[in-house]
C-alpha cells in the first residue's frame, strides 16, 4: 500500500468509519492516469465502431482506432438528459438523489449540493491532479462549482448552462426581447469562465457563436497543457473533458466546416474525432499511454431521432440512435443507451466488446477500486464495481437492472432485456407544434405498465405484457429496493419547471 492509499485508509478508519468504504486497489500496481472524454447528445448509431461513421457520412477514423485498441460497451446506459446524466456520472447515484433529474436551464434552482461527493473528490483524495475543461452543467452556485467538488482547475462555459447559450444574445437582439444596448447585452450574456480550487469564477470572454465554433480547440489545448504539466510534476492525473461534440447548435470550426456529407452535425462528429485523436497523440508523446485509462462516451442519446420518425428530415443537429427508439429527454432505449469505449493498454484487451449492462454510475465505484480510494457509505451509491467487465474477467458484470427518472417521476425500469414503462411519454402538440424528446409530456399508465423485450424488439414497437407479464415481478422488486433506501435517505425536491 503506498503512502496516499495508507493515508486514505487511516483517514477512513479514524475519521469517518461510518461514512466511507475503501475498495481494494489492484495489487499494489501503479495508479493509472484517467482521461474521461464526454461527447454531448451523440447517439448510439453515430460513430464508426457502432455502425455509423463513414456509413453515416462522417468518418471517425481515430475513434475507430480507439475501439480497435480497447473495449466497446454495447449496453452502456445513462440518464435521459445532460444534467441528470452528468450528475449520475459524477456522484455514482441516480440524479434524483441530488435533485438533478431535469436539465438545468437559466433561472432554475437546481444545483449540486455541498454534501454531494463527486468523482473529482475521489481522485483528489487519492493524490491526483484533477481538471475539467468544458461543460459542468450541475449548477453555478459557489457550492456547486467543480472547483468546490475536487477539481483543481476548470475552464469552460458557465456551470449552469449548455452550448446553445452561445445563441442567447443573438436571439434576444433579433426579437427585441430586452431593452438593452447590444454591447451591454454582450457583456451581460453568457461568458467563458475559469476557476481554480478555492477561488471564484473568473470571466474570460463572451461566449458568442464565433467562440462556440472554435471552443473545442481551446478545451483540447487546455487539456494537453494540463497533462504535460502533471507529467513534468510526476503526478497522476484525472482529466474530465466534457466537450461540445454533438450538442446543438453544432457550429463546426473553420477547419471542419463542410467536411462531412451530412451537414453541420457530421462536421462536428469529424471534428470531435480529430480532437479525440489529439488527446491520444498527447498521451503517446508524453510516454504515458500505457499508464492511462481512457474512456470516451456520450452523456445521452441524440436530438432529433423522433423528429425523423415523424417525417422531419431537416433538423441540422439530428443524431442517430441506431436500432433504438427515442432521443434526448425521453426514457426510451435510444435516449439512455449510447456508446462507450474504454482503452487501457496491457489491462483492457484490445478489439473486444461487452454486452454486460453498464451504467454511467458504475464508473464511480469502479474508478474507486482501480485507484484504491474510498466510496461514501453515508448515502446510497447506485453504481456497482465493474472492474471485472473492463478487465475481461466477467461477461455479465454486476448489474442487471436500472431505473429511469424524469423530474420527480420514475418513468421506467430495466431488468435484464426487459423494459417496463410506468408513465406514457409522448410528444406534445400536433402537426408543426409536435415536440418530442425533452419537450415530451408524460401521463400515468392506467393500471398496468408497458413492457418491451429490448433484445427481440430494440425499437420498442411491440408491447408484450400479455405474454410476459411475469417480468413485472422482478422489476417491481427493483423498484421496491430503491424505495426502501428512501426511508433512511429521502431525496431532495426534484427539478421542476412546470408545477408551481
Where does each model-flagged region fall?
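Formylglycine-dependent sulfatase
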Residues: 2, 7-16, 25-445, 449, ...
Amino acid at each position: 500500500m503506498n503512502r496516499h492509499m495508507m493515508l486514505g485508509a487511516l483517514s477512513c478508519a479514524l475519521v469517518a468509519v461510518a461514512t466511507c468504504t475503501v475498495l481494494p486497489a489492484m495489487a499494489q500496481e501503479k495508479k493509472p492516469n484517467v482521461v474521461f472524454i464526454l461527447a454531448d447528445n451523440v447517439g448510439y448509431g453515430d460513430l464508426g465502431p457502432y455502425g455509423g461513421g463513414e456509413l453515416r457520412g462522417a468518418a471517425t477514423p481515430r475513434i475507430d482506432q480507439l475501439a480497435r485498441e480497447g473495449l466497446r460497451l454495447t449496453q452502456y446506459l445513462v440518464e435521459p438528459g445532460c444534467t441528470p446524466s452528468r450528475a449520475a456520472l459524477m456522484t455514482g447515484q441516480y440524479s434524483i438523489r441530488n435533485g438533478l433529474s431535469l436539465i438545468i436551464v437559466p433561472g432554475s434552482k437546481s444545483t449540486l449540493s455541498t454534501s454531494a461527493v463527486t468523482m473529482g473528490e475521489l481522485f483528489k483524495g487519492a493524490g491526483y491532479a484533477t481538471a475539467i475543461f468544458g461543460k459542468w452543467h450541475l449548477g453555478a452556485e459557489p457550492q456547486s462549482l467543480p472547483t468546490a467538488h475536487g477539481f483543481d482547475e476548470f475552464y469552460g462555459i458557465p456551470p449552469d448552462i449548455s452550448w446553445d447559450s452561445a445563441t442567447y444574445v443573438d436571439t434576444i437582439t433579433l426579437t427585441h426581447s430586452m431593452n438593452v444596448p447590444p454591447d451591454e447585452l454582450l457583456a451581460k450574456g453568457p461568458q467563458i469562465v475559469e476557476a481554480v480550487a478555492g477561488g471564484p469564477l473568473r470571466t474570460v470572454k463572451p461566449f458568442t457563436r464565433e467562440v462556440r465554433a472554435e471552443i473545442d480547440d481551446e478545451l483540447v489545448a487546455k487539456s494537453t497543457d494540463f497533462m504535460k504539466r502533471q507529467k513534468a510534476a510526476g503526478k497522476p492525473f484525472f482529466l474530465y473533458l466534457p466537450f461540445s461534440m454533438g450538442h446543438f447548435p453544432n457550429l463546426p470550426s473553420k477547419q471542419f466546416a463542410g467536411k462531412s456529407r451530412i451537414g453541420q452535425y457530421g462536421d462536428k462528429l469529424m471534428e470531435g474525432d480529430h480532437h479525440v485523436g489529439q488527446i491520444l497523440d498527447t498521451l503517446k508523446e508524453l510516454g504515458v499511454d500505457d499508464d492511462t485509462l481512457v474512456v470516451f462516451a456520450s452523456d445521452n442519446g441524440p436530438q432529433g431521432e423522433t423528429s425523423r420518425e415523424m417525417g422531419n428530415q431537416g433538423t441540422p443537429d439530428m443524431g442517430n440512435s441506431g436500432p433504438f427508439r427515442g432521443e434526448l429527454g425521453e426514457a426510451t432505449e435510444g435516449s439512455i443507451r449510447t456508446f462507450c469505449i474504454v482503452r487501457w493498454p496491457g489491462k483492457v484487451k484490445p478489439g473486444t466488446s461487452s454486452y454486460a449492462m453498464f451504467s454511467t454510475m458504475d464508473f464511480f465505484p469502479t474508478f474507486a477500486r482501480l485507484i484504491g480510494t474510498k466510496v461514501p457509505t453515508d448515502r446510497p451509491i447506485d453504481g456497482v464495481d465493474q472492474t471485472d467487465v473492463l478487465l475481461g474477467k466477467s461477461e455479465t458484470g454486476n448489474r442487471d437492472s436500472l431505473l429511469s427518472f424524469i423530474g420527480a417521476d420514475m418513468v421506467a425500469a430495466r431488468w435484464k432485456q426487459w423494459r417496463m414503462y410506468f408513465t406514457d411519454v409522448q410528444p406534445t402538440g400536433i402537426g408543426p407544434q409536435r415536440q418530442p424528446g425533452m419537450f415530451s409530456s408524460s401521463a400515468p399508465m392506467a393500471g398496468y405498465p408497458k413492457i418491451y423485450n429490448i433484445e427481440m424488439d430494440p425499437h420498442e414497437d411491440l408491447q408484450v405484457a400479455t405474454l410476459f407479464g411475469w417480468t413485472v415481478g422482478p422489476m417491481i422488486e427493483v423498484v421496491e429496493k430503491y424505495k426502501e433506501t428512501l426511508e433512511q435517505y429521502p431525496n431532495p425536491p426534484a427539478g421542476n419547471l412546470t408545477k408551481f
